[in-house]
């Protein structure tokens, strides 16, 4: 699926399969797909100066590694002492830089709608300064990032689609605009 493809792109770019920067060398459970071996990365003239692979499912392990890699020059943000959403957003914000390459796998899993809006602002600003993002998301908030190319995975095909054509947008809009009718229909059948 989408997360497998994102992971393969991350590994092909040299990121740790569990997440982090290209400098992260750890493995708690090696389960990544061999798809990365079949991907050939074609790079353009610009080289990213920084990058990060952030995935909700292995965030705890990455936060632990962040603490282990901390030193005097790069103190720990003490992610385990914060709420899940606060630590996830802080880690993302601490690692976003212009001209970077970022791969985010379902970041909304850890974030409230308000924190998703905060992340949207950060992503938008970094993208305007040359950063490139690949984000797998079901969040209609994050799908709404201005000027984003949205790819939909439907019936075995991958294609560009408009924001309003995404299932996440359509289902959310339907629920918000017809909540009671939808609940009545779903819960009485």
Predicted regions and their residues:
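Conserved nucleotide-sensing/catalytic segment adjacent to the nucleotide-binding pocket
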Residues: 23-83, 163-185
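GG-anchored amphipathic helix commonly corresponding to the ABC/SMC/Rad50 NBD signature/C-loop
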Residues: 82-106, 114-126
């Amino acid at each position: 699926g989408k997360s497998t493809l994102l992971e393969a792109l991350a590994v092909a770019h040299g990121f740790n399969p569990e997440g982090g920067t290209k400098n992260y060398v750890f493995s708690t459970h090696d389960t990544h797909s061999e798809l990365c071996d079949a991907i050939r990365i074609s790079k353009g003239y610009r080289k990213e100066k920084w990058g990060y692979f952030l995935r909700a499912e292995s965030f705890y392990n990455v936060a632990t590694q962040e603490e282990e890699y901390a030193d005097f020059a790069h103190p720990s943000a003490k992610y385990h002492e914060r709420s899940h959403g606060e630590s996830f957003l802080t880690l993302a914000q601490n690692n976003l830089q212009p001209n970077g390459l970022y791969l985010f796998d379902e970041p909304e899993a850890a974030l409230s709608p308000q924190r998703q809006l905060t992340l949207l602002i950060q992503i938008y600003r970094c993208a305007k300064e040359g950063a490139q993002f690949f984000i797998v998301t079901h969040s209609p908030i994050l799908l709404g990032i201005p000027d984003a190319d949205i790819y939909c995975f439907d019936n075995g095909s991958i294609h560009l689609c408009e924001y309003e054509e995404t299932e996440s947008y359509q289902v959310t809009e339907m629920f918000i605009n017809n909540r009671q009718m939808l609940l009545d229909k779903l819960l009485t059948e």
